[in-house]
Amino acid sequence: MSESLKNCDKIRSFPITERYRNIDIIYEDNHLLVVCKPANMLSQRDRTGDHDLQSLLKQWLKDRYRKPGEVFLGLVQRLDRPTRGVMVLARTSKAASRLSEQIRKRIFKKEYLAVVLGKNIKNRELIHHLEKDASRNMAVVTSGQAEPVGSSGKPGPGGPRGSRLAVLDVTHLETQGEHSLVKIDLKTGRFHQIRAQLAAEGTPIAGDNKYGSKVSQTRHLALMCHKIAFEHPTRRESMQFTAGLPEEFPWDKFRRPR
């Protein structure tokens, strides 16, 4: 099955209270919950104590079905706090285990979209070595382009000790003025990988001041998980969910008239 959503900003599919107004619930069954996480919301609880998607959805399930006690909701896929987009959560431990296995085997597919600063964007594979700078909460590119060394992600030639191989594909979709819309397919999953690698190529994501984007009227980081595709954990049918572009700048430069 395939479901499409216009953006990640408004609830449409299910009755919902004011408390959960910023979360789009795209699909629900006894095994899965597919949602569109808004920008600047945590995927799961951390030490800040700020609202997080997983906890809010657990409470939503309790309220919706009047469930006493603890509700299981497994987070098998995560998005960084500033990144919006489609996520699937598991309502049973069996579904969580099977979805996690699909991620390990690369059966689970994720497609990201980003608006970057730059005009002459080439379709290419980006290969870097990244190291996490915990003091600044950033990923640092420690070497230039390098050859991959298999799927393990261990440093190859030119990769300093402590670094990890980061690989992604960039596809140019459209350019409007100083902004370009690109599609990103991750080959590895590293901390801040997309943000760090695009910035290293001189095309930082719009609104990403941490990685060198100039200050603009962009409200949020212009990065989203646009599409996910996987096999249903019990029915074994193909599932695909897509979120459309947000209505805010700079995404609105690439939205088509209705």
Task: Identify the role of each PLM range.
Residues 1-258:
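RNA pseudouridine synthases
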